[in-house]
Regions:
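Proline-aspartate-enriched helix->loop->beta-strand connector
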Residues: 184-207
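DnaQ-like (DEDDh/DEDDy) 3′-5′ exonuclease domain used for proofreading
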Residues: 1-190, 219, 309-310, 314-333, ...
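C-terminal, non-catalytic extensions of nucleic-acid polymerases
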Residues: 605-608, 612-857
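Active-site palm subdomain of RNA-directed nucleic acid polymerases
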Residues: 285, 558-585
Length: 857
């Protein structure tokens, strides 16, 4: 039995929970809203996370609850669990640990018509009708498309639908938009979760607005479950502007764009559905068409239907491959949070800790009031500057779950804090080095301030079984803290799930292998999210010292790993030693001094073993961890590269010959243009080929002339659309106001690609183009440098990346003055320079090749 969602009734007296039972039926259950909290009481039968006695106070109604809470707060009395919303209390009480059943998921995509004289319709101005909606129901494995024929095809009927479309979907031809919307609401009646691509800011609010306009005033409420609350808009800042997002109740709406971003481990150069589909589902490319969607709808209605269907089929394909919505459901239910909470940063972790406190530890948690924002950011991950250049046979070791491991090793948890050294990290260093300099300790419970020599404090901490972090925060090791206890449980569960995944793989059970892989992935996400949550002031267990202690301790742990590698390979405990190439967060890259993959891998494994053997003594000596906790930190051998270029922090390119102990032949890119930029795929693939050949040992004298030839080909292209420089643009609206104001100084501060976007929008007005989209904040654009200024100000023009072919006026007035030389430099020379100059290699030019051939040929 799984819950879909839970809401508090309008009068706050009931909690409504929608449930999908074991028979697949959706029902609604109502519970009395629980109103209670705990207060300190020496005779109380409950205890808090610090072991103090507390007692529970129950209230008959919300008014009594809030009045009592206010009274206790005004009297300075600590409260427990008064800030947990009733719906979360109900979910925890009734659904924790329950088996998770399948929910009904529906993917959909809408297509909207527009008037060429008015331009594109939007949520703010939803004047145009919905032309078609493609739907995929996961439960029934059915694809359905609802479509209204254009005025150019008034006699189009069901019989006119081509067979290839009928083979792919159930097509329902609607007489008008009213019928289409009515049928859409009927289709989603049994859907628990609806999902589209960028549906939060377009599809869902647009359907809501059109239903209210075309059907009746509150028809859009059908997006919610019956007997639920009415939807409402919330404002979200996006790309520097405020946008409206519709919040629905009962039925869950998950924007798959957000889901994908949230769960996908690696950043993508572009999150346009077309690019994601090309990357993830090459067999399901987004369909392309010539001209505008306006023309496609009227001139080729059949292809228009295919286009709509394909977008929804892509969403199905992504979920089939990634299982991200299924993961979101399982993750939320394991912590008894709402499904939409998975897209946030703290609620799932918070709910999981509260459940652990209740059901594993039998304790209650204190209220939390978010402190005022200081505007300060705590230190992030540690990076060791690279030895820039090309290195042969390098390898890396990686710390297992670095931040969760540190929190477990030092028992980092709010209730475990015993005090803070005023000198922070300086005090930590002095105590580690057993200095006789005085440091000052501020006792947590009493605020008492005590100064004593660092070496004396070391003995005191050791005697009391207290650990010290890299921040100088002191944690009691006597009783396991709530956060380390949760992390230990998750770590053990992940280990068990990975074991079961391996057993299923050995048994040839693909379904169970996939299930356990997803379960271990959820635990990985939970483990990695805890540190970030602890640094969020809205987190119930927030204390910035928890996050800072973790990162600064992590720095020392990483430094030790680098020094230990140097000790093994160079005989000196010094991370500046020759062997150390680079370090980042939890990984160290180092020279193996070998000349073949097997020897390099063997050496890397030996180094890893030596690191692991050194950690117990290091953790005990440096942080005063007890014997058990000193065993937690572990490193794993990660990669071996026969040739790689280390460029700068977070920028490197490696050809791998081994990965996780297995011999491979593949590339690893970090930060470099062919990994992070939105270069046209044709150019990106070509540059990647040049780099791969270089790192596999091919002579640059052979590759260089091919680079020059490739640039010549680009320069000679008649079609300049391939030469646009990809950019993301923000604050277009704000900067347009500045531009139109005539403020000379203000205009100078407008970024070049934003200026180019303003020019595009001006051209739409000048040429009377209502078919091409305007560039707005958040748009992806292609920028073209020009050989001369336009209006004495514009040196480039942008084109929206969403359109396949620019309008005729662009080719007539701008294509002839595109600066091809500048564009090729930006697309080829500049990215290549970033990637190869660190190895002492120059980007080849025709002039340079002719000169060298003349001298040495």
């Amino acid at each position: 039995m799984s819950y879909v969602s839970a809401i508090l009734s309008d009068n706050r007296r009931k909690v409504k929970v929608w449930i999908r039972d074991d028979k697949g039926q959706r029902t609604i259950q109502e519970f009395d809203a629980p109103y209670y909290f705990y207060i300190p009481n020496e005779d109380g039968t409950d205890i808090d996370i610090k072991g103090n006695s507390i007692s529970r106070l129950d209230f008959q109604n919300p008014s009594d609850f809030f009045n009592a809470r206010k009274k206790y707060e005004e009297n300075g009395i600590s409260l427990y669990e008064s800030d947990i919303q009733p719906q979360y209390k109900i979910l925890s009480e009734h659904f924790y640990g329950k088996e998770i059943t399948q929910l009904n998921v529906t993917f959909f995509d809408i297509e909207v018509d527009y008037d060429k004289d008015i331009g594109f319709s939007s949520v703010d101005n939803p004047y145009a009708p919905v032309s078609s909606i493609a739907i995929y129901h996961q439960r029934t494995d059915e694809t359905i498309v609802l479509a209204v024929p254009p005025e150019t095809r008034p006699d189009f009927t069901q019989d006119d639908v081509p067979q290839d479309i009928e083979d792919e979907a159930i097509v329902v031809i609607c007489k008008d938009e009213k019928e289409l919307l009515q049928m859409f609401f009927k289709e989603i009646e049994d859907s628990d979760i609806i999902s589209g691509w960028n549906s939060e800011f377009f599809d869902v609010p647009y359907i809501y607005e059109r239903a209210n306009t075309v059907l009746y005033k509150t028809a859009g409420n059908k997006l919610c479950f019956p007997n639920s609350r009415e939807p409402y808009y919330r404002e979200v800042e996006k790309f520097g502007n405020m946008q409206k997002a519709l919040v629905i109740h009962g039925r869950v709406h998950l924007d798959y764009l957000d889901v994908y971003k949230n769960f996908e481990m690696a950043m993508k150069p572009s999150y346009k559905l077309e690019h994601v589909a090309d990357d993830e589902l090459p067999h399901l490319p987004k369909l392309k068409y010539e001209g505008s969607l306006y023309s496609l709808y009227r001139d080729d209605f059949e292809e228009f239907i295919r286009y709509n269907i394909r977008d929804t089929v892509i969403l199905k394909g992504l979920e089939d491959k990634k299982k991200y919505i299924e993961t979101a459901v399982q993750m939320s239910h394991m912590s008894t949070s709402q499904i939409v909470d998975v897209l946030g940063t703290i609620k799932v972790a918070e709910s999981a800790i509260i459940n652990f406190c209740h059901y594993d530890m039998g304790v209650r948690v204190p209220d939390h009031k978010a402190p005022e924002s200081t505007g300060k950011k705590y230190g992030g991950a540690t990076v060791i500057d690279p030895k820039v250049g090309m290195h042969e046979y390098s390898a890396s070791v990686d710390l297992q779950s670095l931040y969760p491991g540190i929190m477990r090793s030092l028992n980092i948890s709010p209730e475990s804090i015993r005090g803070q050294f005023a000198e922070r990290g300086v005090a930590f260093g002095l105590i580690r080095d057993e200095s006789d300099k005085k440091v000052t300790f501020i006792e947590e419970a009493t605020g008492e301030v005590i100064s004593a020599p660092a070496n004396q404090w070391r003995r005191v901490l050791d005697r009391k079984n207290w650990a010290i972090s890299g921040l100088g925060t002191v944690f009691d090791l006597e009783t396991e803290g709530v956060i380390p206890a949760v992390l230990t449980k998750w770590f053990a569960e992940r280990k068990e799930y990975k074991k079961k995944m391996w057993e299923a793989k050995q048994a040839g059970d693909a379904a169970m292998e996939e299930f356990w892989d997803r379960m271990q992935y959820i635990k990985k996400i939970q483990l990695n999210s805890m540190y970030g949550a602890c640094g969020n002031r809205f987190f119930k267990f927030f204390d910035v010292r928890l996050a800072e202690s973790t990162t600064l301790t992590g720095r020392e742990v990483l430094y030790h790993m680098a020094r230990q590698i140097a000790l093994e390979l160079n005989g000196e405990y010094d991370m500046e030693a020759d062997a150390i190439i680079y370090g980042d967060t939890d990984s160290i890259y180092f020279k193996t001094y070998k000349d073949n993959p097997q020897d390099a891998l063997d050496l890397a494994n030996e180094v890893c073993d030596a690191i692991n053997a050194s950690y117990p003594e290091f953790m005990s000596r440096v942080f005063l961890c007890d014997d058990k906790r000193a065993q937690i930190m572990k490193a794993e051998q990660e990669i071996v590269s026969d040739r790689g270029i280390y460029i700068e922090k977070k920028y490197y390119m490696l050809h791998l010959v081994a990965n996780d102990g297995e011999f491979v032949d593949k590339m690893k890119y970090m930060g470099v243009p062919i990994k992070t930029t939105k270069l046209p795929s044709e150019i990106k693939d070509k540059l990647a080929n040049f780099i791969e050949r270089l790192l596999k040992g091919e002579d640059w004298d052979i590759i260089g002339p091919e680079v020059v030839h490739f640039k010549d080909l680009l320069f000679g292209l008649n079609d300049i659309t391939l030469l646009g420089t990809p950019k993301g643009v923000n604050k277009v609206e704000t900067n347009t106001v500045i531009f139109n104001s005539g403020d000379i100084e203000g205009r100078k501060k407008i970024a070049g690609h934003c200026r180019a976007s303003i020019l595009w929008n001006k051209c739409l007005d000048s040429y009377g183009d209502n078919e091409s989209p305007r560039i707005m904040s958040g748009s992806k654009v292609l920028v073209y440098d020009l050989t001369r200024k336009i209006d004495g100000y514009f040196t480039s023009i942008a084109v929206p990346k969403d359109i396949d072919i620019p309008p005729p006026w662009f080719f007539e007035h701008f294509a002839p003055i595109v600066d091809k030389k500048s564009q090729v430099k930006k697309l080829v020379d500049d990215p290549m320079r970033v990637m190869i100059s660190a190895a002492g290699i120059k980007v080849p030019t025709k002039k340079k090749l002719v000169f060298e051939e003349g001298l040495f040929g």
